[in-house]
Amino acid sequence: MISVVGGVYEERCKYPAWNQIYGSGLRAAIAVSSVSDTVSLHAYVPEEWTKDVELTLASFGVNGDLHASKHPMSFEYLHSFVRVDPPEQQPSLYPALSVESDVVLRFGMMESDARVKGDRVVYDPQAPDASYYCNGSNAGSLAMIVSGWELPGTRAELLKRRSEDRQESLMPNEDTLLKAIINLRDLPHPPQIVLVKDGLGGLIVFQGDQPVSVPSYAAESFFRIGAGDVTAAAFAHAWGELNLDPVDAAHYAARCTAYFVEGPRLPLPSVAGVSDRKPNTIRRERIRIVGLGDFELDALAHTTQGWLSYLGGDVSYVKFGLEGLASNGQDDIDLLLVGSRCSMKEFEAAARADLQPTVIFWPSAEAFAAQFYFPDAVVASDYATALYHVMRSSKQ
């Protein structure tokens, strides 16, 4: 049995098109409904969504402890790396939810808090410097799962980087990360396990003296919205309910994340159902980008350089257009960005230039044609999927 405490929110994304009611709480409860005997969701739900949410929970066999709220909240995305507008802040918080269960997965929420008690608890604060115990929550064993910059003490370093106009990064550097873990362990009630998400489906597990890296696992596509929720849910099931070792549970969570992002697909398979997933090797080679198309591709090419650097990639050069590529001896391209209005004539010119792109991003209905000209390339019409494949090692 597992109890999930978390938000239910609307999610809207332009690329890829997505308009659904999920949020961390609802997504996680659905995720584990196939592998857990009993799942309960404890959440605030806007009155106009209550009937739909109840029907959704019933279809997956999830028990709902739903509390009415009056303010629907929506997360807006341009694409899955860019959240356009955060939800409006609530005028006041609703009363804290109170949950007690053997196994609890607790998410941070926008509209309220949750006071929980459990034998094994997984806490995903979804905010920097959050404390599990400050509201009276208790746990026999506590696992905390966070993004790197959510660790206590990292906020100051992040603000410093921004003030110096340095390149944004998904993860703190190793020194900052280790200092944050040490500071966390010095708290009066530290978590026994800390898992840091790497943004591509992998994890770093801190338990004992040595951190253990758990790789991301291979996926054909990469639907990023909600991937962290699925990671937390899968780990909570494997560690909390199945009593797996934390590292083994983290491997299961990473495999489940790869399963989810290929769809998105819910609910999740069992441990045996994802055992054949192959691990990724994160790219260490330098990345080469070429943009092909209209003026906006020049801007997209440089923006993409920033995103790949954010994900930990090392971009060696960015080129707009085909001129001079052969003379520079740089025909092997890691990412070819093709404009949505790029003509087949321009694309055929790229093929005649004998480029050998590893990944092609082409947000066009004609994207399938790219496979004819570049049969060995991964062709993606989704931006996050293209970046994901670029970040996988070319030597795999």
Predicted regions, residues:
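Short acidic-hydrophobic, aromatic-tinged amphipathic segments that line or gate anion-handling sites
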Residues: D65-A68, P375-A386
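Conserved phosphate/ATP/ADP-binding segment of small-molecule kinases
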Residues: D119-P211
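Short, well-ordered secondary-structure micro-motifs within conserved domains or adaptor modules
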Residues: E100-G108, D119-V122, G324-A349
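Redox- and metal-dependent alpha/beta enzyme cores, enriched for Fe-S-associated oxidoreductases
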Residues: E150, T154, R283-K319, E323-A326
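Glycine-rich phosphate/adenosyl-contacting loop at the front of the ribokinase-like
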Residues: M1-A43, E48-D52, P215, S221, ...
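Conserved N-terminal subdomain of the carbohydrate kinase-like
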Residues: I2-V5, Y9-N19, A31-R120, R277-I287
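A short, well-structured beta->alpha microelement
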Residues: V82-V103, G108, A127-S131, L308-D331, ...
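Conserved post-catalytic alpha-helical subdomain immediately downstream of the catalytic base
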Residues: I21, L26, A218-T281
